Amino acid sequence: MLDDREGASAGAFAVFGDNRAVPALVALIFVTAVWGVTFVQVKDAVAIYPLFAFLAVRFAIASATLAFPAAKRVRGLGRGGVAGGAFLGLLLAAGYALQTAGLERTTVSSTGFITGMYVVLTPLIALLLYRARIGLAAWGGVVLATAGLAMLSGIHAGSVTGDLLVLAAAAVYSLQIVLMERYAPRFDALAFTFVEMAAAFVGLLLVALALGDLGVPRGWTVWGALLVTGVFASALGFLVQTWAQRRTSATRTALAFSMEPVWTAFFGYTLAGDRLGALGWGGCAAIMAGIVLAEPAAAAVLVNVVASRRGSRGRSRPRR
């Protein structure tokens, strides 16, 4: 997370008022569009290729893409950084496994919006782990998103299992985000992310081997999804995100990231044929409203968690 370099009340004109920030904002929105279209590709791919094998190859490609630029930096992480990156990488693998298993059982649009609930769940995870204070906006986001989830899952009974799996994935992503705040200020971002993706690859590979699911991917449906998710959505998506976030504020970044469920719904409707009906789209709208309401609260909670942990470390280990 970045420090908010301008107030959240800057207004709509502030989003585009700084010409230097416009390319960064456009880049972030492009990344969210790529993330959105991958839901359609992954759903098609895992229909014909085993889930854990697909995810293992995806993270193998992502790790290989980042290996060269990150190789010289990994040593600088030390044992603590490598161990932390490996642990968070395994959490990442668990999140993707749950999300993809849910995607197999529900619609693309539902998966995108429910995944976005990680924003709503992040303050709750911080409350459980660090007793962080969360305001009314965060609780309002929880209420809206929960109501939206109930509406979305009420479309047809067959989607409930898939929706709950995706919700579990969102909870894992929230846990990873909160724990990441322990490491983000201390370690090189590129090297740390490489370790995360490599650990995710190893974990998913072991599961695929244990299940006997590993095989050579065949056909453009599978390979196209692997290349887009492995190279563009994961590796290059991270690099663009890192470049853009250094050139814009946390407020603009939050605005861009909130577009991911919207892109997912767009591609789900146009490419996957999602037809959710009034109740389903109403649920999506409620979840989106909850995300937008909770986003600033989630960012503030994480900033406060980092500040409090830095303060406690400073008191227990004074400078020499």
Regions found by a protein language model. Give the residues of each.
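C-terminal-most transmembrane helix of multi-pass membrane proteins
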Residues: 2-17, 22, 26, 59, ...
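Transmembrane alpha-helical segments that form core, pore/gating elements
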Residues: 40, 52, 62-66, 122-124, ...
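C-terminal transmembrane-helix exit sites in multi-pass transporters
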Residues: 65-75, 118-140, 262-282
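Hydrophobic transmembrane alpha-helices of multi-pass small-molecule transport proteins
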Residues: 2-6, 66, 88, 92, ...
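Hydrophobic/small/kink-forming positions within alpha-helical transmembrane segments
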Residues: 33-36, 40, 67, 89, ...
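Specific transmembrane alpha-helical segments of multi-pass solute transporters/efflux pumps
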Residues: 34, 38-39, 67-115, 151, ...
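Helix-helix packing/entry segments at the starts of transmembrane helices
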Residues: 56-57, 111-119, 179-202, 234-270
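Membrane-interface helix-cap regions at the ends of transmembrane helices
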Residues: 37, 41-44, 48, 61-78, ...
